[in-house]
């Protein structure tokens, strides 16, 4: 027998003792706060949790890269330890889930919309899979004492985290409480919220940690067991097919039940493995030689070597070749599964479904007979292996049981964006958790862009009293929703009675520095636009800067209280200057200060402090549009800086954002805003159907590439090609944004791309407020 395996069997050998209590079934002897458990004589185990990655929707090339990287991870496993890779299917606790996603009532006149939204969320939650998959790696090793074990796990943990990072997954260590919670949730399904464990208090009171996780009863029968009122069964993979698809593990875990699938891996040192295979090959060659000698003695000189002997020789040579030239390692492994159900009939039906799934892949599962307790302790991530149905595999063969499928997006206090097409689970994302929360919503006309944006706005207004929403609306699409949500619609045009003072400014405008310096930059840009887009000379810039400081002097001295100056005051300040250039500037801007286009030269007469503001710029003429865009963006910056001082978040939605990129100054201002707002607690969203046009602007291309959150709905063919290049989208992923219905597409969250579908019930008030379909508005 191979030395490594012999040593391992020796270490795992334990005296069998009939369990006297429920607690004694659990094979943990001692726990430490950092998550290391003693699970045998000098055998220590530690568990790491790793996140799923988008394997199922990746391109063939990406899948190959992930497969090879996962093979590297398996190759890097230490020979002296046993590694257990576990997939834990657990059902979300309904009550806990509802508390997390449902919007509490606020008695502010909007509760009827909250009730509607909650009904929609509950419908989606009921139709969803409601199964969450957690994935763990448990390393168990024999060491003399806890200090040696701790040093070992620190080194191994760093390696594991590095390998998972390269796969695009995040790996974290679990402490004692986190590990105990896994077992508690399995043993006590339905009581997930009741788990509470404090190591210090438990030690002080002399309680046993097993009391916090064990079920009320354990009953082990010939081919199943009972945990409390539930039934369970452990099965193991007995027969392996010659060829197994990489989707087998994912298909086995698709069953909508509480279950755990574990693969125990025992790597063998390459020198031992080569020696073992060479000995086997030598044995095969000896058998062939003996057979040939016997045939020769019988004068049968042309006899062909029997097929089975030839196969043994061929397979042994291939195995040896794998070990010596293809960087494969010999691994011993056993695959076990435990699944639970409410009734025995349901359990039998689930077992048959799992056996059928395995048969589809030409593999054969078998139920463990009279070994259910050992099987249960093997399948759960304790770090023990009590089932000896080991199979010899190479790294490549073992990597087929790849534990990755699809990434789930479920953030705390997030916004509902639809359902994951693959797992059918709800997508709840919180842009605050990303490196920058800026976003784009892209899609052809009719794909559901406005609806998606309105749904997000509605969610923010109804759920977060500490957040404000500002909309730039060039198509007058958002007014009904804004009015229904008690917001303010500001109509901006040359003839409108609504006015925004271009010179408005608060004390927080300067980001800690003198606000006038930053405002002076804005006035310079504004004057360049007012003069006709011509570049200002050095003299003109100096005059404008001097006049800006002069016109704000009294407002600054009054600590930014009272009435701010207007563009009319600014022009009067220009006229006071002696330089002829000042008179020229004053004359050039007269149309916009005292003439017919003076809407931005008057004091602000609208409520810019409402929680929900919509700037309606549909009637902004060609002459006023560049200036109007600048003034609106500056007004938004004013609000963002005010909110920052109050500790409030600001969400900005800009529909038809490509309009802003048609004017150099508004494009540059927007680019600066995009980069700066993250530190102000603000999040910008650009909405457009013209992706190709948008990407003609280098500024827009940079903004799109740097946005961490992108909602891609149905795309035109040219736009798809551009997006695929920019965001590295595979052909398979592209199919989710090709000729799909409204509200379907791809969601980019950080580095993840998740296919989603979002259907909102039509028989609701909210739907009527959000739809832009002709005949439904």
Locate predicted features.
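Extended, folded cores of ATP/NTP-driven motor/assembly subunits in large transport
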Residues: 1-404
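P-loop NTPase motor domains
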Residues: 53, 60-79, 90, 253, ...
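Hydrophobic anchor at the beta1->P-loop junction of P-loop NTPases
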Residues: 441
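P-loop (Walker A) phosphate-binding loop of NTP-binding proteins
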Residues: 444
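Conserved lysine of the Walker
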Residues: 449
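Hydrophobic positions on the alpha1 helix immediately C-terminal to the Walker A/P-loop
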Residues: 452
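Post-Walker A helix-loop "phosphate-sensing" segment adjacent to the P-loop in P-loop NTPases
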Residues: 459-470
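A short helix-turn-beta junction within AAA+ P-loop NTPase domains corresponding to the substrate/partner-engaging
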Residues: 486-490, 699-712
